[in-house]
């Protein structure tokens, strides 16, 4: 199986993955929220709600949401967890612009700030945030382990990292239906709704290739996180990964 880091939205295009991902999300931004609801029958909202509930066991004053997209997770965290601030970063200006409008509509401008940012080079000092999250974005990283190291760097000792990522069901009963849906139905809907024909073919390819379960937990451990856990949801079609930064970790842990 090809490494997910080598799977790009536009295949043989010579540009690096980050550039292709930015172009893809700029193109599909107007249809992105609708497609998320349609593809998951609205279950993506339940997955985010579950993730935020897992964070609620401790108070987090400052939260970073990486690959924030149109801000769904950032907005839910701001409205539920009562943080002082939620910062969301994303490569796509078009996605961020839609997210800013949603933040304004939710009257959360004083709590949520969205801006352009690269997960591999986060513009924040060491040990800045109490929690770092990323929903459905890890598949798009050009280097997953480097992205996790950056998350670890900007997280305060004792802080939490939480990842939501799409995954492949392990059940031999569920998997054939899932494969048909992701490889045939979703790309067809994408071609009808979105300007970008390739984007929704890239989706099942990247899901199939992204590290899952124990393999993803191993990457979190390699980046320095403690006790990573994988929590499968909805027959294993989505997985939440959660881990901690060691409380004794020195503040200056630059890589």
Predicted regions: what is each one?
Residues 62-121:
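Class I SAM-dependent methyltransferase SAM/SAH-binding core
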Residues 226-255:
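Core SAM-dependent methyltransferase catalytic element
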Residues 31-34, 41-61, 76:
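Conserved alpha-helix/loop element of class I SAM-dependent methyltransferases that forms part
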Residues 1-23:
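N-terminal auxiliary segments of SAM/dcSAM-dependent transferases
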Residues 120-131:
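A short acidic, Gly/Pro-enriched loop at the edge of an enzyme's catalytic core
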Residues 32, 132-133:
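Hydrophobic beta-strand segment of the Class I
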